[in-house]
């Protein structure tokens, strides 16, 4: 789980939970020894919100229970700031995108990362074609420049 994924999870929690959720998250993250969903759930207060229990189970199913402290930290930071700060992203293209392309890309990315996503569009002609999309610490590079470099590397190692 990347930092931006933890931020997305924390944002969703912040939007729907109260102070008892933060206390429950802290309790869950403080379990000593092997982290299992059962041990973490047992550490939660009885009044822990259903969303917290679901989060613990989801992290356990995905093998990411060790990421719970990062989620707690992100949640605490948002609580101190009084809310979630928008997630920022950048879309770099080889040519200027028309309004319809920008709208389609924006719709797809906000569907994945949430409505608070702030996108910036820019042009880098050296990409030759394709896009580079950066959201938080995630990068999706579909540029022709990168593909050509990969082909060149493969040819040199063959």
Swiss-Prot record:
Keyword Transport carried by entry: yes
Keywords associated with the record: ATP synthesis, Cell membrane, CF(1), Hydrogen ion transport, Ion transport, Membrane, Transport
UniProt-annotated location(s): Cell membrane
InterPro entries (alphabetical): ATPase_OSCP/d_CS (IPR020781), ATPase_OSCP/dsu (IPR000711)
Membrane topology: Peripheral membrane protein
UniProt key word Iron-sulfur: no
Chief location bin: membrane
Record Pfam families: OSCP
A GO molecular-function annotation: proton-transporting ATP synthase activity, rotational mechanism
Any single Gene Ontology cellular-component annotation: plasma membrane
PANTHER family, alphabetized: ATP SYNTHASE DELTA CHAIN
Family: Belongs to the ATPase delta chain family.
Subunit field text: F-type ATPases have 2 components, F(1) - the catalytic core - and F(0) - the membrane proton channel. F(1) has five subunits: alpha(3), beta(3), gamma(1), delta(1), epsilon(1). F(0) has three main subunits: a(1), b(2) and c(10-14). The alpha and beta chains form an alternating ring which encloses part of the gamma chain. F(1) is attached to F(0) by a central stalk formed by the gamma and epsilon chains, while a peripheral stalk is formed by the delta and b chains.
Primary role: F(1)F(0) ATP synthase produces ATP from ADP in the presence of a proton or sodium gradient. F-type ATPases consist of two structural domains, F(1) containing the extramembraneous catalytic core and F(0) containing the membrane proton channel, linked together by a central stalk and a peripheral stalk. During catalysis, ATP synthesis in the catalytic domain of F(1) is coupled via a rotary mechanism of the central stalk subunits to proton translocation.
Protein name in UniProt: ATP synthase subunit delta
Source organism per UniProt: Roseiflexus sp. (strain RS-1)
Gene this protein is translated from: atpH
């Amino acid at each position: 789980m990347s930092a931006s994924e933890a931020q997305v999870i924390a944002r969703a929690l912040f939007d729907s939970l109260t102070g008892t959720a933060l206390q429950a998250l802290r309790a869950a993250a403080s379990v000593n020894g092997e982290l299992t969903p059962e041990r973490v759930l047992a550490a939660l207060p009885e009044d822990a919100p259903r969303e917290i229990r679901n989060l613990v189970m989801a992290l356990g199913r995905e093998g990411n229970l060790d990421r719970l402290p990062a989620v707690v930290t992100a949640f605490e930071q948002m609580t101190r700031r009084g809310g979630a700060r928008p997630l920022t992203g950048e879309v770099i293209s080889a040519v200027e995108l028309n309004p319809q392309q920008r709208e389609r890309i924006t719709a797809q990315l906000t569907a994945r990362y949430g409505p608070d996503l702030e996108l910036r569009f820019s042009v880098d002609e050296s990409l030759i074609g394709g896009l580079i999309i950066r959201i938080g610490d995630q990068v999706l590079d579909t540029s022709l420049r990168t593909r050509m470099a990969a082909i060149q590397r493969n040819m040199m190692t063959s």
